[in-house]
């Protein structure tokens, strides 16, 4: 379990996993920094010995702005974490899981966003574009490694109750926009996790290259 800032939250997840009777490890890492990603995977190698699955869940958003207002620094951060970081992590996972590299196969699940197809105009076009790139990576990598025993899919959450809205300066965003969702509510993180678990499980062993929307019908 990697984290950048919320150590207590990461350690709480580790505790939950251990209570359930299995092992877990929390490692601080910035997924946009290659050296830190290499250290993260090295720690996992030392602790667990092999890799079976990767969930690319790291993501950032910024304050709502139009493209005309965005700085290069903001754009670089958005793509470094949301896109490049996922590429680096996927690369390291493939090197460990691919049957071509002596691995046993596995699954990669990228956490994208329905913003990738809606565009998020007037708010987060940069975030939407970074997630759109993640969608394309999902499709291309799925085809690239399918014969190597690795499945690659993505979930695209919609309006979900998480802290990311507060970090973007809109802590009330879910409550405010929920009436626009066909199901008339925001989603829960657990509902996204359920889809991720299915995509990592043997129940989806013939599914790869899929983009699964978890959006309450927000099309």
Label the predicted regions.
Residues 61-64, 118, 196-197, 208-219:
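Short C-terminal tail/terminal secondary-structure segment
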Residues 50, 146, 151, 207-209:
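Short, small/polar-rich loop/turn modules that mediate ligand/substrate recognition or access, typified
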Residues 95, 143-144, 205:
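Alpha-helical segment proximal to the catalytic Tyr-Lys
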